[in-house]
Structures are given as C-alpha cells and as structure tokens.
C-alpha cells in the first residue's frame, strides 16, 4: 500500500503493484489455509466450549458474514435464518476460522451479481447452517487445492459435527451440521 501511494503517477507501476498485492493476498490466504489444515488435522483432543443456545453462538457470526458481504456489494438472502431454543457445543476458535474460510471462499469464487443465500435448519438431533452462492463463470474452482474446505471438514469432525458441499443449479452450497446437546 505504501508503494502504491509513492507510485501513483505511473500507471504501469500501479498495474504491477496491484498484481503483486493480489498475489500477496493469495499467499496469505494459503498460509492461513495450511494453518487451519494443520490445526484441524492435529490428533490432540480439543475442548468444546460450554453448550449454548444456537442463536447466541451463530447469530453474531451470520450477522457479521451478512454485513461483510453486503459491504463488498454482494446481495444476501438471509430470509431462511431462524433459531429455536436448542443448544450446541462448539469450539469458538474453530468456528471463527470456519466462517472466515467460508467468507474468503465466497469472495474468491462467488458471482457478486447473484445472491448469497444463508439459511438454518433443525432436525431432532442436529442444527445446520447452509450457505449457497452463485458460481462465477470467470472464477474457476480448478485454481483451488481444496485445502480450505478440507480444513473446514476436519474442524467440523473434531467438534463432532459434519460438513458437506454440493454444486447444483449454478450454486455452490456448504452445509455445516452440529449435534444438538
């Protein structure tokens, strides 16, 4: 950023600096993904935080994701979010990394002209969060090593939950499922 300020007058330099900034951000993201993957794949047992109401745990996370996406000009459909008086036990540090990873993936791969859909669901035994986004034609998933989603899956398993994803009707969906305690 400092270099950009000092080189404002030179369009070619700005083009190169923007490219370099993009690559630095890509590297930072991959380092974060590797850290997540390492943490998630550890054999050391994790402690789950005390069980709490799902609204208390997930309300702020989902609200923050909505706000971040809308600030970046994404349309968000959060009509499907609802909460019931049930409790889950999670590791908040893992949950923070999971939502950060999913938000980063939306920025990297989603079409910001199509809405990001967020919804919650309940069964007798589980609470789930689903996030779906339109897939942008000029952003390819082939560039991805899939480390981020593998990390999310591993962190979910370590919290006794599960993660699944699917691609259908031009949307990419991620589902996080947590056991109700």
Predicted regions span which residues?
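Short flexible loop/turn segments at helix-to-beta-strand junctions
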Residues: 42-52, 89
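Short beta-strand/loop element within the Bergerat-fold HATPase_c
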Residues: 113-125
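Short conserved segments within the C-terminal catalytic ATPase subdomain
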Residues: 68-79
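Short helix-loop "hinge" at the ATP-lid/N-box region of the Bergerat-fold HATPase_c
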Residues: 105-107
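Detector for a conserved hydrophobic position within an alpha-helical segment of the HATPase_c
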Residues: 156-157
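Short alpha-helical segment of the dimerization/phosphotransfer core of two-component systems
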Residues: 22-27
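Glycine-rich/acidic phosphate-handling loop/turn and adjacent ATP-lid/helix
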Residues: 129-147
